[in-house]
Amino acid sequence: MQHIRNFSIIAHIDHGKSTLADRLIQYCGGLSEREMESQVLDSMDLERERGITIKAQTAALHYRAKDGQRYNLNLIDTPGHVDFSYEVSRSLSACEGALLVVDASQGVEAQTVANCYTALDLNVEVVPVLNKIDLPAADPDNARSEIEDVIGVDASEAVLCSAKTGLGIEEVLEAIVARVPAPKGDPAAPLKALIIDSWFDNYVGVVMLVRVVDGVLKPKDRILLMSTAAQYPCDQVGVFTPKSVAREELSAGEVGFVIAGIKELEAAKVGDTITLATRPAAEPLPGFKEIKPQVFAGLYPVESSEYDQLRDSLEKLRLNDAALQFEPEVSQALGFGFRCGFLGLLHMDIVQERLEREFDMDLITTAPTVVYEVVLNNGDIIHVENPAKLPEVGKYAEIREPIITATIFLPQEYVGPVITLCNLKRGSQIDMRYHGRQVQLIYELPMNEVVMDFFDKLKSVSRGYASLDYEFKEYRSADLVKLDLMVGGEKVDALSVIVHRASAQYRGRELAAKLRGLIPRQMFDVAVQAAIGSHIIARETIKALRKNVLAKCYGGDITRKKKLLEKQKEGKKRMKQVGNVEIPQEAFLAVLRVDEGK
């Protein structure tokens, strides 16, 4: 026990977590030269391509320290992106220590702070590491003072290293051994193991990544999952040295995997406690809070015959992604599909991309929306995540929208444009602090303003230097209305959006104009209208294509021409009564791309 160290690496995106993990694995001989590749722990193609970590991964390393002892180091690599912050808290709850990696040239950024506070809340020992000191722009002293200023962690003994060149890696390992406490736990007590993560493997079923707190777990033991009371025979236990290696047993303080022939992922819930059926623990370990999706969007197959395939694909994805939620829904415009819940926009983007890549699906996505609280006239409260499900205008007393608290870090010179952007998005400033060259802005913003395109806009007004972290605060009453779009007098449910009354006229006009350009011309006039309730606020007309019926009259009598024109008019009128308009895929995406106040 004294020679085990469990630690994870936390940092802002692109501060070098995965590279540092590579170096530590290489230094401790976890993989041979041939198997070593960059970002070993990012196993998904998508993770590699975007250069982000999505799933937390682990590696068990052996390190002979300068005091001559051999230590077992369990490394858990965590994602840095705000959408995956729950992955971070899960990883941290399995550790006693965390390496706080800060890019010496960038200083402290938003996720650095958020993740570090998560670590401190869980009583994890934080070891600051200044990375990228080989860069000419590196300024370790400034980074040190920012860590002390902003986070309040003592950084006088921060380790300097460069994960790219391998400089200072030994010092990092020594710091882990010296400063991270050994795990506490009793190998003789009844087994308690926390499930940190679980995923589905095609050959062995569900693989659970666990941290053993008390007791010992061996193959052939019957295990009991405490939240569902289900029992399974344990087939295999082991550790990842990124590759999986089977072991005789996992004992208190260790992190490893358990395979127990479980077929469905729902059975192995993350945050659940595993114990032995023969000698169960009295009470489970404190788990994690359930993750609630923040952003909803409809996913529909382009070919309606692929509906079943889409359902299977979503179910397979959910095996690896506990946060994804979906339920079937029907849209008059798009047919059968699913309403999916995501943690944020990046998560939505990634799920969509994985469906298209790994499962070959062609998808139509509707505009992302957040969950609104609607107070009905009789006082009942319902939650609405789909604009089409909003009750009619007289049926409810008020709509409340989710408000988030956003923390934005940015260099001083971009404060003006960022404040302007936040005000455009109906934000209210709570606080503003200066830390050296960096400014920390704290704003309250309505979540549906953030969902659309806030992140992209923030990056563009600050040239990519601003970083954002947000958390849900509360539901607050607002003057919101449902904007319907009608094509040829028919409501298109998939194009409805919920907007603030102040920007409704503008949005309505913009959307109608956009759709006019996207819907192909028909043989008859098509009206594109934006409406709030029964009140039409904007209209555009798609002009009909017409044949020149007078081409065959050379000269001739005016009454003859009139007769032909009248006949054409009659025909168009009849077509208009029976004609229906095909709406192209681009039209659904247009809803996403209407810019607020240009």
Swiss-Prot record:
Stored InterPro entries: EF-4 (IPR006297), EFG_III/V (IPR035647), EFG_V-like (IPR000640), EFTu-like_2 (IPR004161), G_TR_CS (IPR031157), LepA_C_sf (IPR038363), LepA_CTD (IPR013842), LepA_IV (IPR035654)
PROSITE patterns: G_TR_1 (PS00301), G_TR_2 (PS51722)
Record-annotated tr-type G domain positions: 2-184
Catalytic activity, reaction form: GTP + H2O = GDP + phosphate + H(+)
GO molecular function: GTP binding; GTPase activity; guanosine tetraphosphate binding; ribosome binding; translation elongation factor activity
Compartments where located: Cell inner membrane
UniProt keyword list: Cell inner membrane, Cell membrane, GTP-binding, Hydrolase, Membrane, Nucleotide-binding, Protein biosynthesis
Family statement: Belongs to the TRAFAC class translation factor GTPase superfamily. Classic translation factor GTPase family. LepA subfamily.
Xref: HAMAP family: LepA
EC code(s) of this entry: 3.6.5.n1
Domain of life: Bacteria
Function: Required for accurate and efficient protein synthesis under certain stress conditions. May act as a fidelity factor of the translation reaction, by catalyzing a one-codon backward translocation of tRNAs on improperly translocated ribosomes. Back-translocation proceeds from a post-translocation (POST) complex to a pre-translocation (PRE) complex, thus giving elongation factor G a second chance to translocate the tRNAs correctly. Binds to ribosomes in a GTP-dependent manner.
CDD domains named among the record's database cross-references: EF4_II, EF4_III, LepA, lepA_C
Location, primary (coarse class): membrane
A biological-process GO annotation: positive regulation of translation
GO CC aspect terms: plasma membrane
Protein name in UniProt: Elongation factor 4
